[in-house]
Amino acid sequence: MKKRVMIIGLDCATPQLVFDRWLDDLPNIKSLIEGGIWGKLRSTDPPITVPAWMSMMTSKDPGTLGFYGLRNRVDYSYDKMSTANSTFVKEPTVWDILSERGKKVILIGVPQTYPPKPVNGEMVTCFLTPSTDKQFTYPASFKDEVQRVTGGYILDAVGFRADEEEKDRVLKTIYDMTEKRFRLARHMVETRSDWDFFMMVEMGPDRIHHMFWKYTDPDHPKYIAGNKYESCIYDYYKFVDSRIGELLAKLDEETSVLIVSDHGARAMVGGVCFNEWLINEGYLVLKSRPAAPAPVEKCDVDWSQTKAWGSGGYYARLMINVKGREPQGVIERGAEYEGIRAELIEKLRALPDHNGNLMDTQVVRPEDVYKEVRGVPPDLFVYFGNLAWRSVGSIWPAQPESVYTFENDTGPDDANHDYHGIFIMRERPGEQSLQAEGLNLKDVAPTVLSLLGEAVPADMEGKVRTRDHLGKD
């Protein structure tokens, strides 16, 4: 019987819900855990969808990949940004390697696969696809079958940061999207017999966390007991588990199955207006304030007086205005650069929250966490409150009374990302449950290749985590 590997990716599925709170109510996931290897999966720095999935599937860290989030600096100018789609991925993925070796692959919804690249098999691209009017399959002719089977494929739940009156509509879209994706996956298993590697990624968990976390987490500062969405995330997890069960029922016993996520989730307390803080501290100087809230690249900044600026998001990126690197750089390379970095690290780590308590902010130098640093990296990553707070990048028309805010500048959002996702792997039937420690997202690609009996490229940064290899490293 042919050896195969299937990965079911659940973007943002988080261990405190899957492993700790709801496992007994997720029978299909529980059955894989009871006969497989499982544990928390350390995400990338930063722990975010792009670059995490591609780091997972290339076994290379973001520094090697050369992109550090969905949007990245094009160069060392102040305003040029680009979206990291598939054209940014220069390192070989698992499916690239398998395709070159004559193995058949099927991909559905894996982040950063748009625009589609040729594979030895079939592909449906990801949430970065602008619409299904674009070419979102490989081969192009596969598009008609996808639309017929799904009744109209849904790429993403657009508007997941919607206002209150839109929540029911978007919630229905999340369910419809998930249903169609799993329907397509079942169809592919039923109608294709020659695949070796199958991977799908469902974005629904991420969307539902960001939209409904405050309604379901009693520890969230905005939680209200008895609200109409209290069981919303729980109900969705049970729905996903049922669809996983239907898909597993289509597989033979020689198929190894992995369920993985790229990062976890946690309650978001609020936001730190990062650039406003930098203005207050004298690092960022404006010529004038904007007429409406705006990011730095759209503001009238006095770059000749500016030492550093930042970006917003679930984590912050801090850039230093370096002489000879940025167009109007003021900080000399070497000792002055390292001095201001050290100064900023010290100040950010000491930052109190809105109540005056130490926030426990983590600050990361790229060179400390990456094997090498390519592209145009930030000078520092900042995880406010150890990811309990987000970075708000907007600069306001008038100086705010406080750098702390409890309303998101890009729409309602009450969950942040967390450092650990989930890893569950059933290699073969009839084995005992084994909880593994120290699992890293980069371990997935070499593990898949090993399961298929394929040689693991020497430059992959992760470890093989099959049952035979655990404990040997």
Predicted ranges, named:
Residues 2, 15-194, 203-210, 463-468:
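Active-site-proximal alpha/beta segments of enzymes that process anionic O-linked groups
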Residues 377, 397, 438-440, 444, ...:
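Long, internal low-complexity/basic segments
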Residues 3, 10, 17, 24, ...:
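Secreted, luminal/periplasmic, and some membrane-associated catalytic domains
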Residues 28, 343-350, 422, 443-451:
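Generic recognition of well-ordered alpha-helical segments
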Residues 7, 197-201, 258, 424:
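Structural motif
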Residues 171-193, 198, 214-259, 263, ...:
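A long, amphipathic alpha-helix that forms part
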Residues 386-445:
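Low-complexity, glycine/alanine/valine/leucine- and proline-rich hydrophobic stretches
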Residues 98, 200, 318, 382, ...:
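A short aromatic-rich beta-strand->coil structural motif
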